[in-house]
Every structure is written in C-alpha cells, then in structure tokens.
A protein has these predicted regions:
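N-terminal leader segment of winged-helix/HTH proteins
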Residues: 1-49
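Charged, amphipathic alpha-helical coiled-coil/dimerization segments
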Residues: 4-9, 76, 89-152, 156
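N-terminal helix-turn-helix DNA-binding core of bacterial DNA-binding proteins
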Residues: 21, 35-83, 88, 163-167
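Active-site phosphate/pyrophosphate-handling residues
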Residues: 25, 57, 82, 134, ...
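Hydrophobic structural patches
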Residues: 30, 59-62, 151
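A short local structural element in Rossmann-fold oxidoreductases
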Residues: 42, 122, 159
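A short alpha/beta connector and helix-capping loop motif
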Residues: 155-163
Length: 167
C-alpha cells in the first residue's frame, strides 16, 4: 500500500496570500448566522412541533400564499426543486399539505396547507416570533428597522453575485 500523502504535504505558511477577516466579511457573517439559526430552529421545531426548519419555511410561505406551485416555493426560499419536492412529499404524507394537479395544466400543482397543517403553522409561528424577538433584543427599535432595510436591500441586490454572467 502506498504511503499516505497526508504526512508528506506541508501546510502553506500563514503569511502567504490574502485571508478573510471573518469579523468583517459580510457573506461569511450572513452564512454563519443563517446556519446557526437554521440548525437551532430545526432542533427546537422538530422537538416541539415535529417539523424541521425547511418544512416550517414552506409551511409559512403556504400560509401567506396558499395554492402556489412548487416553482414559487423554490423561488421565494431559494431552494432547488429536488429538496422542495422531497419536503413537500413528506408534508403531504403526514397530512400537513395538499398537493392538487392543476386541471388546466397537468404539469403544475397547487399546494396548500391542510387544516392540520394550518394548525401546526399557527403553533410554530408563535415560537418563531419569540425566537425573532429574542434574537433582535440587543437592538433598539430604530436599529431593527435599519437592519430590516439593509437586509432587504442586500436581498434585492443578490443578482449582482448570483447572475449567471457573473464570474
């Protein structure tokens, strides 16, 4: 068996090339916050309500926009079709959503919360608002408004880095 290449590879010196300042690099901050919020939400929502954070995101969108197709869910929450489709199948199997084929276009489906799904949503949303309140408790009301405005502007500017023509 050939010797492991791990022992022969030397790490690059720390002072070679640029590095990120993780205290100032905005994409890292956003990613770290999102990951930690998502992981803790999944653990909490799963334990308390039997839904994970992806299921909750979809259910919350369906409460706002009942009867939408999966493509709309993908667009709004920024997930690929595969994970959304699998999540919807699980929600349907558990009786939380209803998926109906559009009679005018058999390729399109209308997705809505069932009564059971709406009841679950109505329990989870109370906890979601409480988590948001606790997260933002370190900010004044004015700072919260500024944060929301800045996040909205960043969201609207995502095309600057997600556009397929961007290198």
């Amino acid at each position: 068996m050939p010797p492991s290449t791990r022992s022969r590879q030397r790490p690059a010196p720390a002072d070679v090339g640029p590095t990120l300042d993780l205290d100032r690099y905005v994409p890292a901050f956003i990613t770290f916050i999102a990951n930690k919020l998502s992981n803790s939400a999944t653990a909490f929502y799963q334990k308390q309500f039997g839904v994970n954070v992806t299921e909750w995101r979809i259910m919350s969108l369906l409460a706002i926009e009942p009867g939408i197709p999966a493509s709309r869910i993908c667009h709004v929450i920024g997930f690929d079709k595969g994970p959304v489709s699998r999540t919807l199948a699980g929600l349907e199997k558990r009786g939380l959503v209803s998926i109906r084929t559009d009679p005018d276009d058999g390729r399109t489906h209308s997705i809505s919360l069932t009564a059971r799904g709406r009841a679950t949503h109505d329990k989870v949303i109370v906890a979601a608002f409480e988590r948001e309140k606790r997260l933002l408790s370190c900010l004044s009301k004015d700072e919260r408004e500024v944060l929301i405005d800045l996040l909205r502007r960043l969201h609207e500017n995502l095309g600057a880095v997600t556009d397929s023509s961007y290198g």
